[in-house]
Amino acid sequence: MRKIYILGLVAFSAMTLATYADVIPTLSSITPSGSDFTWNYSANVTLNQRVEHDDFFTIYDFGNFVPGSNTQPAGWVFSSALLGRTPAFVLPHDDPGILNLTWTYIGQTPIIGPAALGIFSVNTSTNQLRTADFAAQATRNGGPNDGTKISNVGDIAVPVPEMSALLPILSVCSAGLLTLLPSFLRRRQTG
């Protein structure tokens, strides 16, 4: 009886893993480009999923980049905004003061997974990295839920914010410390 239970659990786990599907961007390289750096992301669509017209992925809190430096495969369009395009049912962290990058598929021919979607790039002034979130929306391929949208979220490497992005945070912290300075000086004089 125990053997049947374990075999059933293994079979259920295998079915669950087989139906798991995502669009996954991954930082593949950072290369020097003059005084800047090109951040290259490779993206893939996994099994049981397809990319259709208007499916997309967003890299949150990327920060400043060189305008017009973006490159993407044919059939994809680039956009950036402070509040990223976000698929339903996921809650990525999105700082409203840091730019997000979104690539949207505008092609008419679905890309059936598993498949490499290509390299998506943008230039920025740093090669220092940190972790942020990405989210993606694609379409279920096959089965009783064929054609329904699938959302996923995960971690991805992005540039460390420039000092200009940190300036408001440093200003607030400095102002807070300055308000404490008179109190500190009074205590020092009385002590």
Predicted regions and their residues:
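Bacterial N-terminal signal peptides
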Residues: 8-16, 175
